[in-house]
Amino acid sequence: ALFVTLPGYEGLYFQGVGSNLRSEAFGFEAQQYNAQMLIAAPQLGDWGETSADQTIALTEYLLSAYNIDPQKVYLNGYSGGGETGSLVMEKRPQLYAAYLAVSTQWDGDLQPLAAARTPVYMAVGEEDSYYGSEPLKSAYEELRGLYMDMGLTQAQINDLLVLDVKD
């Protein structure tokens, strides 16, 4: 299995080598679920197309270089890293078994994600200090609408899409 975790501001490259590992515990937490899971925690240079393309290239490289089950490749994006993750989900949603978007906004196009039916779990605080909760709520509603337009049942949608808004 492979878990790719994309950092927020504190984990960007200019913050210093390894700062993403000191400021965010997503990769360490993922190992609690699967001790054999390979963790990739790149330090991005931005939250845009360049980092999205680099994330995809890194994932493809790791899949080719290591014995990783392609059905167990997961992506996580926190804060600005979630913006990058949403662009990755626009470009190559089928590369990942699921995506965890935390305290972020959705910058990518949701159509390719809906077509691929890659499961997404969105988590945000109701009063998130940077983004607020509205951006993820809006993305959730838009993606839910796309699934409804595709004829999916509520049970099928619930298997693919979760919005967890914390008080």
Descriptions of predicted regions:
Residues 2-56:
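Active-site machinery of serine-nucleophile hydrolases
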Residues 8-12, 44-49, 79-83, 104-108, ...:
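Solvent-exposed loop/turn segments at secondary-structure junctions
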Residues 13-19, 51-53, 87-88, 110-113, ...:
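Short, solvent-exposed loop/turn and secondary-structure capping segments
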Residues 35, 114-120:
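Short, proline-enriched alpha-helix->beta-strand connector loops that line the catalytic pocket
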Residues 47-79:
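Gly/Ser-rich "nucleophile elbow"/oxyanion-hole loop immediately N-terminal to the catalytic nucleophile
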Residues 71-114:
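Primarily recognizes the serine-hydrolase "nucleophile elbow" in alpha/beta-hydrolase
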Residues 123, 127-137, 141, 146-167:
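C-terminal catalytic histidine-bearing segment of alpha/beta-hydrolase fold enzymes
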